[in-house]
Amino acid sequence: MKKIVYILIATLLVTNFLSFTPSAEISDEQFTHAVFAEEFTATWCVYCPSAAENLMLIYEDVPGEPYYDDNFFFVALITDVNDKADERMGDFPDVTGYPTVIFDGNDEKVSGGQSSTENYEQAIDTTGQRDDTDISLEIEMNHLGNDKLDISIGMTWDEDGSFSNPTFNGYVRAYIVEKISRYNNYDGDPYHFGFLDYAFDQTVELEPREKQSLSTIWTGGDHQDKNGNDFSDIDYD
């Protein structure tokens, strides 16, 4: 039995945005939004464990290491064991090797193994300060027993529309992950936040100030990895 479906991460992405590049070290209190990173990796990749461990150092409250509280999350997309992870990598033609970490849908990208957290910190700081659309997200996940999860997302565009932009058109992805993955990296250690499946993966159109909700029942036994193994053994934490 795997300790897993620990976290559901949802991202609401827009195709057009303004970017901002910080000139000095910043506090995450200056962030306009939480930064989400997608780590493209493979179990056979020699340099991938360094990426995973440095991302985890940033995520966790480790003395002497950077910490962004609730303003940074990441998922490990292990492409050689998961078709949907492989397809997600295919969304980015400029992502051609392992490991590669993209931030907020490729707002920033860091490629190759990493000897420290420095390059990831810089990418997070830059991405976290970009001008962003004001969207409220409410995420709820309840265990229904066995391998069934009841998942819902509420989204509100907290801005007034304009004549040229009367609605907000975006894309929402909600990732079902294992905090301690069933898959091991090249060093034989479990991945952090290993991707299993999407709860939601779709376009959305939001009206100003109006809440829109999505809900689904996700069943682990209905989904498989590339080896034909399903996820009916999930354990909700």
Which residues make up each language-model segment?
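Generic detector of short, well-ordered, non-transmembrane alpha-helical segments enriched
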Residues: L8-I9, T41, G97, G170
